A protein has these predicted regions:
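Glycine-rich phosphate-binding loop of ATP-dependent small-molecule kinases
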Residues: 1-217
Length: 217
């Protein structure tokens, strides 16, 4: 997705464990300080959804804390869009069978086996529970001004094409309409309808020629 973007104008942020400083700061602090300046992009590989859902699944969040996190995320994203940011969130969905297949491939190679963590193994074992947790978070945080896009990620090329198309559409809309979000009124956050994971087709594939034609288009 980023290979054709001028590297001077974007950053890729991959956040895992919090630093000691970040542990003493508000939940969204480490994301806020990595926001791009005007005219630039920031791609978050994982983000506030993954952090929140993982902590909920592990039992580290009470229901009240989880609810407070949801509210904080809504306000944070609304603050961003009210200040001219284009916020686009992608959930790359694969089936349980495909997940197992990819994990097996990684585990068989000495130079990639390290990528499979205990958390990955646990998530695969509890695939349905994890999917439900992520879907619940997305339903609660998919705003009209900062929607979630659920992507069929069974095929890498098809995934890249879908993400690029959504990004292009989002940027075009943002450029034609600078006011991305409606004013904040009495904590009302319009929600967008989220499709069920079971309704997302996972059989889309592209051959090399078709992929190149679609990408060039």
């Amino acid at each position: 997705v980023i290979q054709n973007i001028d590297p001077r104008f974007f950053n890729v942020e991959s956040l895992e464990k919090k630093t000691e400083e970040e542990k003493r700061k508000p939940f969204l602090y480490r994301y806020f300080k990595r926001l791009p300046e005007a005219g630039k992009f920031a791609f978050f590989d994982s983000g506030w959804m993954d952090e929140t859902v993982q902590e909920k699944l592990s039992g580290d969040l009470t229901e009240k804390t989880y609810t407070d996190r949801i509210e904080s995320v809504r306000r944070f994203e609304r603050q961003l869009t009210d200040n001219g940011y284009l916020v686009m969130k992608f959930f790359l969905h694969i089936s349980e069978k495909e997940q197992e297949k990819r994990m097996e491939v990684l585990e068989k190679k000495a130079d990639t086996s390290w990528r499979i963590s205990k958390r990955d193994v646990w998530q695969h074992k509890h695939y349905k529970k994890c999917q439900e947790a992520y879907l619940s978070f997305m339903k609660d945080t998919s705003l009209s001004s900062a929607p979630w896009y659920m992507i069929d990620a069974e095929s890498r090329k098809w995934t890249e094409l879908q993400v690029l198309e959504y990004l292009t559409q989002g940027i075009d809309i943002a450029l034609s309409n600078q006011a991305l979000a409606v004013p904040l009124l009495q904590n009302v956050f319009p929600m967008t309808q989220m499709p069920k994971l079971s309704e997302i087709p996972l059989d889309k594939e592209l051959d090399d020629n078709t992929y190149k034609e679609e990408l060039d288009r």
